[in-house]
Each structure stands twice: as C-alpha cells, then as structure tokens.
C-alpha cells in the first residue's frame, strides 16, 4: 500500500491524501459472506443516544470474518482475493478451501493473491497461517490473537498492528502488546503469523470534516460551549470551566472508565507505559 497525495485544487483537498488501493484485487464482496448492517445512529432499543458523535455515513455491508479457524485444521486454502472492508482499517483476504468452503480473514502483510495458507498445530511458520501459541517459536510476530482458548481473535486486528511472543513458561505464553504491556496468555490460544497489513493507514490525512462524516462520525462539541439546556457544563457569562467535575450530558461522571480491579489484571506481567514514563 502507498499513500497518494491530492493536489490543492480546493481547500478541502489541500494536504489531503488517500490510499492507492493497489493491493485490492476485487471490488465486490463474496455474496455468501456479507450481512446487512442497519444504522443505529448511536441509539439503543429505546431510541435514546447512548453513544455520541455517531450518525450518517455511507451505507455498508458487514463482511463475516473468521476469527477462529479451528474447524479448518489441516485443510489448505488458497488466497483468492485481497479486498477492501469498510468496517475496519485492515484489508481482508478471501480464502477458497480445498473442500469448497469460502472464508474471510484479516489480511496480514505480504499475503498475496494465489498464496496458500493453513491452520493447525502442524502449520508452517509463515504469514497467514494460524497456530496455537505452544507451537509458535519465541520471538515470532503475530496478529489476531485469542485471549481465551476458542474465544476467537481479540488482539492486534487493526491495520499495522502486531504482538510479539517474547517468552513461554508452563501453560502461559508472554506477549508484548503494541502498548508495551507484557501479558500472559494461555498457550492453547491461537494466533496468526505476521503483522496486519495496510500499515500506512495511519499516515492518511483526511483533509476535511466531510470525509469524517462519510465514515459516520459526527462533530464533537464541548459541553462548556453549550447552553444550560443542552449540557450540565453549559451557560455562564464569558468563558467558564464548567464549575464542576466533568460529567456527560446526563450528569453522570466522565473519565476513569476502566475498572482498577479486573480479574484478568493478574495476567499482566508488566504494565503499559503511561504519562511521563512513555519514553
């Protein structure tokens, strides 16, 4: 993938860029692997906004991705196409298995049309192959990693993401995550070899607010610039600080949303670097 920069023909295109999509080999998805994806606009079943800044955007179809691959152990699959997926930053690969089944997977870096991939404990160590952590050499770069055996891939699924298997002790393998955190994961959990492709995605300059609207993202407006009828921080003469601890439009406290005593915290070997310690 490469980034194509636009010429400054209009203010919105000045400085903006777009992916060249050179790796895409087909523009229409596999019909049997798409599902309707109705828009919710951030509303729940009662019609109230539960997630702000969502709405509009281009119509999409959901591509069903195989995040498990357990049931295809020992069955070879040929990469038929590399496709665009509007629901994620990574590209997806359409696999044609020798038994006639078709599946989508996250497309790792350097995976190309015509390659053959496989899954199972005896698979080769090459991009796109899926194995349990107990069968992967220490030091290997991975993506689409399970957190629980059979639970499906949860870690390192977005464009350019990867984790590294840095050690293996007993029933746990130690993974270095993109944040710098080192975490124990059961060696029965599966992972796919290689890093996720489309790493240049993070370098795209969207250029104008309208391109965000195409993605279904609405503007983010601070509460302190609203009126009192719209937000607890609104109103006042001139600039104000809000006058209270940060709250959401419903008056509930905002910030610090992560539980400090999660059960899975005991699996963390070294915490991610935060604040001044990031360097």
Curated annotation (Swiss-Prot):
Ranges of Basic and acidic residues composition bias in the record: 253-268
GO biological process: cytoplasmic translation
InterPro entries: NA-bd_OB-fold, Rib_uL2_dom2, Ribosomal_uL2, Ribosomal_uL2_bac/org-type, Ribosomal_uL2_C, Ribosomal_uL2_CS, Ribosomal_uL2_dom3, Ribosomal_uL2_RNA-bd_dom
Cited SUPFAM superfamilies: Nucleic acid-binding proteins, Translation proteins SH3-like domain
Keywords per UniProt: Ribonucleoprotein, Ribosomal protein, RNA-binding, rRNA-binding
PROSITE patterns: RIBOSOMAL_L2 (PS00467)
Gene Ontology cellular-component annotations: large ribosomal subunit
Stored Gene3D superfamilies: 2.30.30.30, Nucleic acid-binding proteins, Ribosomal protein L2, domain 3
Region of interest (Disordered), ranges: 30-59, 225-279
Pfam families with a match to the protein in the record: Ribosomal_L2, Ribosomal_L2_C
A molecular function GO annotation: rRNA binding
Basic residues composition-biased segments: 50-59, 269-279
Database matches in HAMAP family: Ribosomal_uL2_B
PANTHER family assigned: LARGE RIBOSOMAL SUBUNIT PROTEIN UL2M (PTHR13691:SF5), RIBOSOMAL PROTEIN L2 (PTHR13691)
Subunit relationships: Part of the 50S ribosomal subunit. Forms a bridge to the 30S subunit in the 70S ribosome.
Sequence similarity: Belongs to the universal ribosomal protein uL2 family.
Record's function text: One of the primary rRNA binding proteins. Required for association of the 30S and 50S subunits to form the 70S ribosome, for tRNA binding and peptide bond formation. It has been suggested to have peptidyltransferase activity; this is somewhat controversial. Makes several contacts with the 16S rRNA in the 70S ribosome.
Record's protein name: Large ribosomal subunit protein uL2
Native species: Kocuria rhizophila (strain ATCC 9341 / DSM 348 / NBRC 103217 / DC2201)
Gene: rplB
């Amino acid at each position: 993938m490469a980034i194509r920069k636009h010429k400054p023909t209009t203010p919105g295109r000045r400085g903006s860029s777009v992916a060249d999509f050179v790796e895409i080999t087909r523009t229409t998805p596999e019909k049997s692997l798409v599902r309707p994806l109705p828009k919710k606009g951030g509303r729940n079943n009662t019609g109230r906004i539960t997630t702000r800044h969502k709405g509009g955007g281009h119509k999409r179809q959901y591509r069903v991705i195989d995040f498990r691959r357990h049931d295809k152990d020992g069955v070879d699959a040929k990469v038929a196409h590399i496709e665009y997926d509007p629901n994620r930053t990574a590209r997806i690969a359409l696999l044609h298995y020798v038994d006639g089944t078709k599946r989508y997977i996250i497309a790792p870096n350097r995976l190309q049309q015509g390659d053959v991939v496989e899954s199972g404990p005896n698979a080769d160590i090459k991009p796109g192959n899926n194995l349990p952590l107990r069968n992967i050499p220490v030091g290997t770069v991975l993506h689409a990693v399970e957190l629980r055996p059979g639970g499906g891939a949860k870690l390192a699924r977005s464009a350019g993401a990867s984790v590294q298997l840095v050690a293996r002790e007993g029933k746990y393998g130690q993974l270095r995550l993109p944040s710098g955190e080192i975490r124990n994961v059961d060696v029965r959990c599966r992972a796919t070899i290689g890093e996720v492709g489309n790493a240049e995605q993070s370098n795209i300059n969207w250029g104008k607010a309208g391109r965000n609207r195409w993605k279904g993202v609405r503007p983010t407006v601070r509460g302190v610039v609203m009126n009192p009828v719209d937000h607890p921080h609104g109103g006042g003469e001139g600039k104000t600080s809000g006058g209270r601890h940060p709250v959401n439009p419903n008056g509930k406290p905002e910030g610090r949303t992560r539980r400090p005593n999660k059960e899975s915290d005991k699996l963390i070997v070294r915490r991610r670097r935060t604040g001044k310690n990031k360097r």
